[in-house]
């Protein structure tokens, strides 16, 4: 009887049918075959890395295969020893190795991830800008997406700033209006002022009035351009234009501009709200009404808390876009700097507090950040945007 013994070790082969257990194969033959388990190598060649019962089944189980011509009675005689050896081999498997987790490791990793995510979110929600003679800090509120914006335009002649525009904008009802105003208003104001400047001498008695009129026209033109798009929402604004030694400040709504003269704060704008007697009278004379809610906030048509703004087409009959404009000569007035901010600051910080904070920070982005943080600590849930403009760079006031 011819016999071939395959006893050389074979590398384990991964097989879906056996869950990765070792499979020992043999060549096919046209003769009848019988699988014999050799007692000496049945356990040695068995793959002990698997705990699956299927890995120890009839597909080989790591046993040596003997191919021979055999009588049926011989096949029966080797079946029982093979099953017995497989059972013994199963009992010899080492226990499953379990590596215990370090106490508190998961909690520490989760806490670190939360801190990182919070820091990234804060960086996305906060913005700081350090420009040439101006600084900006802004932070998103807690109630909705960021709806504040700002704009700066400077014109230089022979290396000196002869004209500059600065603006802070506070949107409501989405970002459409504030984005439009931030992109258009500054250009419209500068173009109108430059046209007026070229048409007459700055020293003429009517020049200042004409510049103020040009600023009003630029505001109204910007509003008309936005309304023509049929887009909802609105925006408040406070802007400053420095031209030929004069400071022109204009505003709509409750954005505010405050100047520091020898350390004393003075508001150059007046908030446009229904709480103002003259604004309430204007609205009522136009057929509208104002009301005070349970939270003490006055609103136009039970809707809007400001009486002048860009956009707000449904209320345009009463909520106009014509700004109030003031002129301040810079020469000899002790002018130091200008603070322009959205109502997220002014609802929590007084004019003098803002001036004191900027003076203590020596005109820097840190001053703006300090004011933003002050408003948040005092409970402001609104967007807060603060811009500081150095006025001394235009003239030695």
UniProtKB/Swiss-Prot annotation:
Its EC number is 3.1.3.16. Residues 133-391 form the PPM-type phosphatase domain. It catalyses: O-phospho-L-seryl-[protein] + H2O = L-seryl-[protein] + phosphate; O-phospho-L-threonyl-[protein] + H2O = L-threonyl-[protein] + phosphate. Binds 2 magnesium or manganese ions per subunit. Mn(2+) 2 binds at residues 170, 343, 382. Its cofactor is Mg(2+); Mn(2+). GO terms for biological process: signal transduction. One of its GO terms (molecular function) is metal ion binding. CDD domains: PP2Cc (cd00143). Coiled coil: none annotated. Mn(2+) 1 binds at residues 170-171. SMART domains: PP2Cc (SM00332). InterPro entries: PP2C (IPR015655), PP2C_BS (IPR000222), PPM-type-like_dom_sf (IPR036457), PPM-type_phosphatase-like_dom (IPR001932). Keywords: Hydrolase, Magnesium, Manganese, Metal-binding, Protein phosphatase. This is Probable protein phosphatase 2C 74.
